[in-house]
């Protein structure tokens, strides 16, 4: 069991100005990471960020800490998280660092690391960084201080990488696409990718001001996108989250297409093209409809713990290549090393064009079970609600009522003080009743 103090399932995250997301902490983190990473020989780190106003402050603090440890930093400016993973590999940097809180509001921020391979740092490296944090900060000699530079063509490099994952023989010239960038890091990337591939692009959520990231736009709130798709009579809509590692889509009828459905489409297309290796990995939150639909196609399916790092770990264990969370993290190891919203959406659009099918029709082979997720906030330090006997008893009653045609999942968020209550079954009314019954039990603790 890990004893990590700061690193959660997706790096270090919190409210800006509150520990640990303070300038002092981030400077010390940069120094500690620099000391650990310098042991591997390289002296170059790539740093990117999303569009939050606090990114500039935290970027400066990180750079100061790295420089004090003797490591140089190359800055990309606002860039999607998967772009930093790609650029870290492309530049053979020792690590990449992203300053982002992904889908969270602007007042949150976080720090996430990528290894030289473009994957998230192993637990033992994160633990080594935390151990270094306990030491007194020292500065290398002036002649050995790290330097700062800017990668001026970072956006162009990543745009070309994304386009390179789309089949050369296909064109998007017939498609009208609404692209919602959540006022986040994809705002200057995604619309250009789709335009350069020939699509008619209607861009929204592309006016970041440092405060509006994820605000009623993007992958976590597709209502505006759904309305825009219908108003523009577009073929589809694509929504990314603030740092571009998630994607949710909308069909021409305004229906939401989530990560489970995206995984189904990509897996089925891989099977049709003879390119599917093994099976597909989802999570404990993946819809039962996905599992049943893949089973009908003869595609093996496995569930990992919630979190894209655990999806990746299971893919590596099994030697499979595709996995996703229903929240829209889609990992395609033949093309990327981490969840990449733009690359995933390109594979879905390629399936549409190749098969002359709408997004709605591509989803038709998978019947979604009604599923409800209720988030219940709890007070940290007051104990674990999941260990409460009343909560356990209510959960057991619901599981007995659902039988084999439904599921209950309770888990603590890895990034926020929340208990996530998920209930899934054949009947929507029953699912809602059971989910709220368990949620009330959690609230009563």
UniProtKB/Swiss-Prot annotation:
GO molecular function: magnesium ion binding; phosphoglucosamine mutase activity; phosphomannomutase activity
Alphabetized Gene3D superfamilies for the sequence: Alpha-D-Glucose-1,6-Bisphosphate, subunit A, domain 3, Alpha-D-phosphohexomutase, C-terminal domain
Enzyme class of the recorded protein, top EC level: isomerase
Cofactor detail note: Binds 1 Mg(2+) ion per subunit.
Cofactor: Mg(2+)
Keyword Hydrolase attached: no
Active site per UniProt: 102 (phosphoserine intermediate)
One Pfam family cited in the UniProt record for this chain: PGM_PMM_IV
Keywords: Isomerase, Magnesium, Metal-binding, Phosphoprotein
Catalysed reactions listed for this entry: alpha-D-glucosamine 1-phosphate = D-glucosamine 6-phosphate
Modified positions (Phosphoserine) in chain numbering: 102
Positions of Mg(2+) binding: 102, 241, 243, 245
Modification after translation: Activated by phosphorylation.
Gene Ontology annotations for the cellular component aspect, listed alphabetically: cytosol
E.C. no: 5.4.2.10
Domain of life: Bacteria
UniProt family annotation: Belongs to the phosphohexose mutase family.
HAMAP family attached to this UniProt entry: GlmM_B
Purpose: Catalyzes the conversion of glucosamine-6-phosphate to glucosamine-1-phosphate.
Protein's name according to its UniProt entry: Phosphoglucosamine mutase
Gene name linked to the record: glmM
């Amino acid at each position: 069991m890990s004893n990590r103090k700061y690193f959660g399932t997706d790096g270090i995250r919190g409210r800006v100005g509150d520990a640990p997301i303070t300038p002092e902490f981030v400077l010390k983190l940069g120094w500690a990471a620099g000391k650990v990473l310098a042991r591997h020989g390289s002296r170059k780190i790539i740093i990117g960020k999303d569009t939050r106003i606090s990114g500039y402050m935290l970027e400066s603090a990180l750079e100061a800490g790295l420089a004090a440890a003797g490591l140089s930093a190359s800055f990309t400016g606002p860039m999607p998280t998967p772009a930093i993973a790609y650029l870290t590999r492309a530049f053979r940097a020792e690590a990449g660092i992203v300053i982002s809180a992904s889908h969270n509001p602007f007042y949150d921020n976080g720090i996430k690391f990528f290894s030289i391979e473009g994957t998230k740092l192993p637990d033992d490296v994160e633990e080594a960084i935390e151990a270094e944090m306990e030491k007194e900060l020292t500065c290398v000699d002036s002649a050995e201080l790290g330097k700062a530079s800017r990668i001026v063509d970072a956006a162009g490099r990543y745009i070309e990488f994304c386009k390179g994952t789309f089949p050369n023989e296909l064109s998007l010239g017939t498609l009208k696409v609404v692209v919602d960038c959540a006022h986040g890091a994809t705002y200057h990337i995604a619309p250009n990718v789709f335009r350069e591939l020939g699509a008619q692009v209607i861009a929204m959520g592309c006016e970041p001001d440092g405060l509006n990231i994820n605000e009623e736009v993007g992958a976590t709130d597709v209502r505006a996108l759904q309305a825009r798709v219908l108003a523009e009579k577009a073929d589809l809509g694509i929504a990314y989250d603030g740092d571009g590692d998630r994607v949710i889509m909308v069909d021409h009828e305004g229906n939401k297409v989530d990560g489970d459905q995206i995984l189904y489409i990509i897996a089925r297309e891989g099977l049709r093209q003879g390119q599917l290796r093994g099976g597909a990995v989802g999570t404990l939150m993946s819809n039962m409809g996905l599992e049943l639909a893949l089973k009908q196609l003869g595609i093996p399916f496995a569930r990992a713990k919630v979190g894209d790092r655990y999806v990746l770990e299971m893919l590596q264990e099994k030697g499979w290549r595709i996995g996703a969370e229903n929240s829209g993290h889609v990992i395609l190891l033949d093309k990327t090393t981490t969840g990449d919203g733009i690359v995933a959406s390109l594979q879905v659009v390629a399936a549409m064009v190749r098969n002359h099918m709408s997004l709605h029709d591509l989803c038709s082979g998978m019947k979604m079970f009604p599923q409800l997720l209720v988030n219940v906030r709890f007070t940290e330090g007051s104990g674990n609600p999941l260990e409460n006997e009343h909560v356990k008893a209510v959960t057991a009653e619901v599981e007995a009522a659902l039988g084999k045609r439904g599921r209950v999942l309770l888990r603590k968020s890895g990034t926020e003080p929340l208990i996530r209550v998920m209930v899934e079954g054949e009947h929507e009314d029953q699912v809602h009743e059971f989910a709220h019954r368990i949620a009330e039990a959690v609230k009563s603790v």
